[in-house]
């Protein structure tokens, strides 16, 4: 509990100065006049990418700590599941096209609406789609699926990428754990997803076979 409160406070205190630094650097970058292929331009691009990663890390720490400390509240309302998936596909279409990856939406007809925080569920889907794109080879396929199962709706993101080793699957939702060969972020994304789904009264899980792909799913109550 003490550690969670410390992380929350530290993340909050870090965000303001780092945001200011990022804005100041962005202004400098706009005004700097270096040839596009120069070493200086490459260095500016590298600094910009690393500052964006730092901002993402701080935001992930802050958001995760808010959930851990019970400070995050949901803004609940009617949520159309098919629209949720279609909008998620739209946000990632450009990235998928750049990798020649097909994004499919497969939603059961006449799904009932969820009573949920749509913004938070979008955050979960964005994280899962980002992971799927990172671990799927060019020319692959990712499916966004939804179906009703009793009094729950099962939403899943399934890819035909590299899969996850069996020995890593048990810890995949723990904070600061990264799996697979391609690392990214601080390993907080899936832990945050699990917190969001649990706050909705749902549960989250994973099915994966190494070399054959991965399916992350969330089971949300109606």
Question: Where in the sequence are the language-model features?
Answer:
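Primarily the dimerization/phosphotransfer
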Residues: 1-33
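Helix-loop junction within the histidine kinase core
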Residues: 65-76
């Amino acid at each position: 509990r003490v550690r969670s409160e410390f992380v929350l406070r530290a993340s909050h205190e870090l965000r303001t100065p780092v945001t200011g630094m990022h804005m100041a650097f962005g202004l400098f970058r706009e005004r700097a006049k270096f040839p596009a292929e120069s070493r200086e331009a490459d260095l500016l691009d590298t600094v910009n990418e690393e500052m964006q990663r730092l901002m993402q890390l701080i935001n992930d720490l802050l958001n995760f700590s808010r959930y851990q400390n019970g400070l995050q509240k949901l803004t609940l309302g009617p949520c159309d599941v098919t629209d949720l998936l279609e909008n998620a596909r739209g946000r990632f279409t450009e990235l998928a096209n750049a990798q020649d990856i097909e994004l499919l939406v497969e939603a059961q007809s006449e799904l009932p609406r969820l009573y949920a925080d749509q913004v938070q569920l979008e955050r979960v889907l964005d994280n899962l789609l980002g992971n799927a794109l990172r671990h799927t080879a060019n020319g692959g396929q990712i499916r966004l699926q939804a179906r009703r199962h009793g009094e729950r709706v099962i939403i899943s993101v399934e890819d035909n990428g590299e899969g996850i080793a069996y020995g890593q699957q048990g810890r995949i939702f723990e904070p600061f754990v990264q799996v697979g060969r391609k690392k990214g972020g601080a390993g907080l994304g899936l832990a945050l997803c699990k917190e969001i789904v649990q706050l909705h009264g749902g549960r989250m899980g994973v099915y994966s076979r190494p070399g054959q792909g991965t399916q992350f799913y969330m089971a949300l109550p109606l």
